[in-house]
From Swiss-Prot:
Pfam families: MlaE (PF02405). The chain crosses the membrane at residues 20-40, 49-69, 148-168, 195-215, 237-257. This is Probable ABC transporter permease protein RT0041. Could be part of an ABC transporter complex. It comes from the Bacteria.
């Protein structure tokens, strides 16, 4: 019994180590291929439109209502200690530092990551990736690099827009629901907001963009055969991206805001 358990644990450990090694090599090849010509600008522009512009409505709606709910919940808690004046500060700092980047990252991971993994996995199953080799085209350069570049560029833009919309949601709730003074609320919003708060969110967004794109491309590129392989690749891309987003969010916060 114990021998079987040890054997099972050993197999999974070796399999995990192999997956990590393959992923590290895949990431290294993708990063090194980015600086090599050609750039495939048309593919990059297409991915910029898909990852950035098409994700904007979902990100905007999510951050708007997150900011609104954050204002309501903060008022409920702070009113017990007569600290209602801190609501605007809590909303803007929470959104710029944490909620904005994390929510946008998870949304893009679910929407874009699944699509990227499914698309590349389908190309793998239908042997379109092999066809690129016959045309003397590097599939990683052609399929992976444009998506990685586009994700790194668009994620900070999505987060920045989402932060503004989220603060606007908190502002509207504060003014029209909680009856705050407009000038006082805006003053409190920007009083304690520092450049590092915004920069930290953009740094996180850039890292999240790389994580989502590289994991999704990896999941699709090394997918199994048939429809089941495509489904597993899609699920793996979303789950692994979401987990790494949360882990890297903590590590970046620990690095930038040392307590």
């Amino acid at each position: 019994m114990l021998l079987n358990i040890a054997n099972l644990v050993g197999k999974h450990t070796i399999k995990f180590a192999q997956s990590v090694g393959i992923f590290a090599l895949f990431s290294f090849i993708a990063i090194s291929s980015i600086i090599k010509p050609p750039l495939y600008l048309s593919l990059i522009m297409r991915q910029l439109l898909f990852i950035g512009f098409h994700s904007l409505p979902v990100v905007a709606m999510t951050t708007f209502f997150s900011g609104a709910v954050l204002a309501l919940q903060s008022y409920t808690g702070f009113s017990r200690f007569s600290a209602e004046n801190s609501i605007a500060t809590v909303v803007v700092l929470s959104l710029t530092r944490e909620l904005g980047p994390v929510l946008a990252g998870l949304i893009v991971a679910g929407r874009v990551g699944a699509s990227i993994a499914a698309e590349i996995a389908t190309m793998k199953v239908t042997e379109q990736v092999d066809a690129l080799y016959t045309l003397s085209t590097d599939p990683i350069k052609y399929l992976v690099c444009p998506r990685v570049i586009a994700a790194i560029i668009t994620m900070p833009c999505l987060v920045l827009i989402g932060d503004v919309i989220g603060v606007m949601g908190g502002y509207l709730v504060g003014i029209y629901k909680l009856n705050f003074n407009s000038t006082a609320y805006l003053t409190s919003t920007f009083q304690y907001l520092e450049l590092i708060d915004v920069i930290s969110g953009l740094v996180k967004a850039t890292v999240f963009g790389f994580i989502i794109s590289i994991i999704s491309c990896y999941s699709g590129y090394y997918s199994g055969k048939g429809a089941k392989g495509v489904g597993r690749a899609t699920t793996s891309a979303v789950v692994n991206s979401s987990i790494l987003i949360l882990i890297s969010n903590y590590l970046i916060t620990e690095l930038l805001f040392k307590v």
